[in-house]
Regions:
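Residues on the lipid-exposed face of transmembrane beta-strands in outer-membrane beta-barrel proteins
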Residues: 31-35, 75-79, 122-126, 136, ...
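Transmembrane beta-strands of outer-membrane beta-barrel proteins
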Residues: 1, 43, 86-90, 134-136, ...
Length: 266
């Protein structure tokens, strides 16, 4: 059980410094259960509620604005193939969101009555060797506006029907490169609606590639034991991507991004 109490004050300097006060609170619940059989099969179920405060935006006044709330039910089964250190997970889910904030073609904001998302997820996590990890995920989502004066029955924007991720990494052991870890992956995001009215076509699906490398310095310099250097790159081919609230509100996605850093473990 969780309790959120959100309060905010907004000052409009274009309207003589008028202030708008918002107070929103909610108690949310979450629980789950899993039973592990000796044969490696583990059915599970979970329920969770969400709460997201929303502040006045555009012509959406403090009297009209409501927090976004959600309820999610998920159930599935895990299967551990111990001999191959591999876990398979399959699940189905249903999510209902109320009062979702969305942009309008007139550069304003409104709140959608209810959006229902239901679908299925599949994932595999495997360690075929002590120094090898493979991860694959796939999700199918059918999302639709179920309560809305304008867009009822339409698919919301920014929600792809299909998403797929694949990642693998390898750690060098018992070689001159001991302490070095390299990884690579691919991400696929399916087509998405451009307009909430579903009348402007779709953004095409995109495929992006990522890489990562890290090195434990202590393997080469014992006095630096605990220090790890890291570098990662997302969208290494610099694939151009887009996302849209509607046909008047679109933006370019993140270009190739490289990050470097270091960490120390005590």
């Amino acid at each position: 059980v969780r309790y959120d109490d959100y309060r905010s004050a907004t000052t409009d300097y274009l309207q003589n410094g008028d202030k708008t006060w918002i107070s929103q609170d909610r108690v949310t619940k979450r629980f789950g259960a899993l039973y592990a059989f000796e044969n490696g099969i583990s059915p599970f179920i979970s329920y969770s509620e969400g709460f997201k405060p929303i502040s006045p935006q555009g012509t959406l006044t403090s009297k009209e604005v409501k927090p976004t709330t959600s309820k999610q039910v998920e159930g599935g089964v895990k299967y551990l193939l111990a001999e191959y250190a591999t876990t398979f997970t399959a699940s189905v889910f249903n999510i209902r969101q109320k009062n979702v904030l969305s942009a309008t073609p007139t550069w304003d904001y409104r709140q959608t009555g209810e959006i229902e998302s239901k679908g299925a997820e599949l994932s595999i996590v495997s360690r075929p060797a002590d120094n090898v990890t493979l991860i694959a995920n796939y999700a199918y989502t059918h999302a639709i506006n179920t309560e809305d004066e304008t867009y009822e029955g339409k698919r919301p924007t920014q929600v792809p029907e299909n998403v797929f991720n694949l990642w693998g990494d390898y750690t060098f052991d018992n070689t001159p490169l001991r302490g070095l870890n390299v990884g690579a992956g691919v991400r696929y995001t399916g087509p998405m609606e451009i307009s909430p009215a579903n009348d402007k076509g779709k953004l095409g699906g995109t495929t992006q590639y990522d890489m990562a490398v890290s090195y434990r310095l202590g393997e080469a310099i014992p006095s630096l034991s605990g220090v790890t250097l890291k570098a990662s790159a997302q969208n290494i081919t610099n694939k151009e991507t887009f996302s849209c609230y509607d046909d008047n509100n679109c933006w370019i996605g993140r270009d190739r991004t490289v990050q470097v850093g270091a960490s120390y473990s005590f």
